[in-house]
Amino acid sequence: SGDWSSDVCSSDLEERGSFRRLCELISDLPSFGGSKAQRNVTEFNYRISDAQRAHVFVGLTTAVRGESDKIAAYLSRHKFETIDITHDDLAKEHIRHMVGGRSTLAQDERLLRFIFPERPGALLKFLSLMRPTWNISLFHYRNQGADYGRTLVGLQVPKGDKRAFDEFLSTLGYPYVEETDNPIYRAFLQA
């Protein structure tokens, strides 16, 4: 027993709500190998790039060595085509940092840095408070071992939803900084 790392790359049809479904599925993963230890998401990387498919890089802690192939198979059975990349050095050392870039599909995108509490349900709270008409166009989270997680989120929010979006941010209660006008965002990510 101990903490092991599993990394998977999951793909699904690009439709609103699929990221939330993936997160719910991950939070409900069964135990493979008898361990009762809770899994934690250590990393999420995503950028909208295709109207038909989404590619999400997910890192998880596991309690049993060799669990990653079972996790990948489980996610695939639930309609998330998944590749176990636990032993793929190219993916783990380089590609994980290159997820993203400019996207012509990210219309009406607002970019925000959030401080998520490191506790179960924090991400699902965020997702459940979002309006179904808003779309996550970018998501980057990496566990740094603190009691909070720095998260960068791109949300497609129609201009007419400004008041509702402000209410969402207030109700959520997580500290945030809007970066939509940041010149680095405009240079590297905004289409």
Please give the residue ranges for each predicted region.
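Short, low-order "capping/linker" segments at domain edges
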Residues: E93-L111, E118, K125-F126, Q156-G160, ...
